[in-house]
Amino acid sequence: MISKHISDREGVYSTTATRRGLDNTPDSEQLDNMKLLAEKVFEPLREWVGGPIRINSFFRGEELNEAIGGSSKSQHCKGQAMDVDDGGCNKTNAEMYRFIKDELEFDQMIWEFGDDKNPNWVHVSYVSEDENRNRCLKAYKDKGKTKYMVI
């Protein structure tokens, strides 16, 4: 188990990896990073939400990240980032974003697309107490390209 509420399978699951036969297994350092992110961000968030939270993406090996067109600098590849979604839980993505911003330490958090009221999902990363930047961004499309602005 990665944490009380995240199984090893859930932390590495990807339909793309399964479909393409890609090995999406983290090494020990990546797994330690995943456990730290779960401890510092996911579990406190889940306790506040009061129930399950959908994880759209957690760990991505390099092959998987390349297959989905992810950034070469993606913290998902280090086990330091996850994308969470309110699908089925009793809080909105916007509420989860605000809770993380106001109550938790994090490295980077992204309001992923959506509109000004609610993102489609929330990207959040955690590095370490000393290295976290508490950086908040908003992702948007401009002429078909994803861009980010500080919020």
Which functions belong to the PLM regions below?
Residues 69-74, 109-113:
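Catalytic micro-motifs at enzyme active sites that drive phosphoryl/nucleotidyl and oxygen chemistry
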